[in-house]
Amino acid sequence: MKKLIDICDIQYGYAFDSKCFTDDSCYPPLVRIRDVKRGYSETYYSGDYPKEYVLASGDLLVGMDGEFNIARWKCDGALLNQRVCKLIAKKGTNEEYLRFAMTKALKEIERRTAFVTVKHLSAKELNKLQLSVPDLSKQNRVAEILSRLEKVIDFRRQELQKLDNLIKARF
């Protein structure tokens, strides 16, 4: 078992001024919790911002409120907002393996987290989180297998959606 902070760096989001939130897409998108899973944002930020909070396509993000989702971001230039963090795998850690391991760990944390209105994931909890991390060659194999399975599942979901649409079109 290894602590999360020993296998990756964690960058926590910035507290952007909500007065500068806009729906004008000429500004950079602002990643909020609800955007993590879907990979895009319809909220933009018109103010000044620190450059270190600009994301790239493929960055690994975690939503820290409600459902604790982990997903890859899908576009360049978005801004990392508070209550969302970015995981950057350290040398010796396969980032896809990290994504799969964190998916399981986050669901377990979510399951055991008490809440009144919305569940919150703290930086303290992430910093002490421990994951089972095999050597890099095994991480690579596990990540490759799970990625292939994930693609098959996604393809099957698309097929089911097409069949569902076909049935609806007939009636």
What is the predicted role of each segment?
Residues M1-A15, K128-S147, D154-R170:
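Non-catalytic DNA-recognition/assembly elements of restriction-modification systems
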